């Protein structure tokens, strides 16, 4: 590879990464304009919020739903690998960020907040803080980068472990969250309420 080719490649990758950063910034600004709180209304920021049905859930840097966002990264890397096979990694990341940021905006809209409150055990859910939502997107990116480097079998094993572990500890995980959002099952809701 010539010096000119190397310079072009660096410039090209830089473009994609700047575009990725722009998507995250657009997510944050949009959530601010939607009236989301920047940080927990409690006035402080915690590295980890271990309560599930607490006012601090979805308000701090990480929580029991962080593994779900890491799994999003695994899945979105796989999608990018399939549909953008010849594109650079940063282009695949941009696709992942569009999907994750789009979900974060939808998740924090009145439509989905109300759906969570009526169809799931999240009766006190009022949406994510901007900080938590941005960190959900960052954790998705971490999952994406992990999946881009790790063997597929290891990535799948970690995803299964996350699902089983969070399902056991808090009776919720990515799979149950999707099921309860799209097609609520009363028996699952009752089981989840036993936490």
Curated annotation (Swiss-Prot):
Per the record, the major location class is membrane
Localization of this protein: Cell membrane
Instruction: Supply the InterPro entries for this chain.
Output: DUF2585 (IPR019691)
Keyword Cell membrane belongs to the record: yes
Source domain of life: Bacteria
Q: Which residues cross the membrane?
A: 15-35, 64-84, 127-147, 150-170
What are the disulphide bonds in this sequence?
Answer: none
What membrane topology does the annotation report for this chain?
A: Multi-pass membrane protein
Q: Has keyword Repeat?
A: no
Give an example GO cellular component term for this record: plasma membrane
Which keywords fit this entry according to its UniProt record?
Cell membrane, Membrane, Transmembrane, Transmembrane helix
NCBIfam families associated with the record: PRK00944.1
Q: Which family does it belong to?
A: Belongs to the UPF0314 family.
> What name does this protein carry?
UPF0314 protein Rleg2_3744
Starting at the broadest rank, the lineage of the source organism is:
Bacteria, Pseudomonadati, Pseudomonadota, Alphaproteobacteria, Hyphomicrobiales
């Amino acid at each position: 590879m010539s010096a000119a080719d190397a310079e072009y490649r660096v410039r090209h990758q830089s473009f994609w990464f700047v575009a990725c950063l722009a998507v995250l910034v657009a997510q944050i600004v949009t959530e601010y304009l939607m009236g989301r709180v920047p940080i927990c209304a409690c006035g402080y920021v915690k590295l980890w919020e271990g309560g599930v049905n607490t006012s601090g859930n979805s308000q701090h840097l990480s929580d029991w739903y962080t593994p779900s966002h890491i799994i999003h990264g695994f899945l979105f890397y796989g999608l990018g690998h399939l549909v953008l096979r010849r594109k650079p990694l940063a282009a695949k990341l941009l696709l992942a960020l569009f999907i994750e940021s789009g979900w974060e905006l939808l998740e924090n809209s009145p439509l989905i907040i109300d759906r969570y409150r009526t169809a799931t055990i999240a009766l006190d859910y009022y949406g994510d803080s901007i900080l938590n939502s941005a960190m959900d997107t960052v954790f998705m990116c971490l999952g994406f980068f992990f999946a881009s480097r790790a063997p597929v079998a290891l990535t799948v094993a970690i995803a299964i472990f996350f699902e089983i572990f969070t399902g056991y500890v808090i009776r919720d995980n990515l799979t149950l969250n999707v099921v309860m959002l799209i097609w609520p099952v009363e028996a699952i809701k009752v089981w989840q309420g036993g936490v």
